[in-house]
Amino acid sequence: MSELKEIYAIEWMGPFDSIDEIKERNGSEDCFIYLITGRLYHKGPLGIRYVGISKRFVGNRLKDKDHRQKQSQLLNKQFWTGRFSVSTYNNLDTKARRNRAERVETLLVRYLTNKSDIKMINDKKVYSDPCRPIGIVNRWQKKFIEEGRYNKPSILSEIPDTLLYVDKEFFAGDKMKLRLYTPE
């Protein structure tokens, strides 16, 4: 078994109904990864349709012409922004930091596209596996409350709370409730 040396915690914020809402959220300027959920035009249920990263502010990336064309395929769009829990990783100015973000994006895109019931509008990274073992832990924050955490919303149920890729296999798990028993 390969050695797993990369494990990252991603703090997700959302859902945002518009790009302007993203700008209002304190801390969103540190976000580098984003999800778009919605329904493909006249097809299927609501779900995750796009995973991307951006060196720039996510709101600006979502306004780009090529991105707006992809988003036009979706109805009932909502946006989720994410950042590494280690703040120095969120700056994608160096090649090493950009590569780290690319590996996280690839892990999420490949995991989601391998599930037969998910139809993504991503056209990149759908065929290449992560280049080395990697793991992420997803943590969910409320839209406008810095300290507020909550359980993963049902629309994001396809993303596990913990996702690992080791030896060409995906391992996934969700949060478990555990109540410690103390005998009296």
Stretches with model-predicted labels:
Residues M1-R49, K55-E184:
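Boundary/linker segments flanking structured domains
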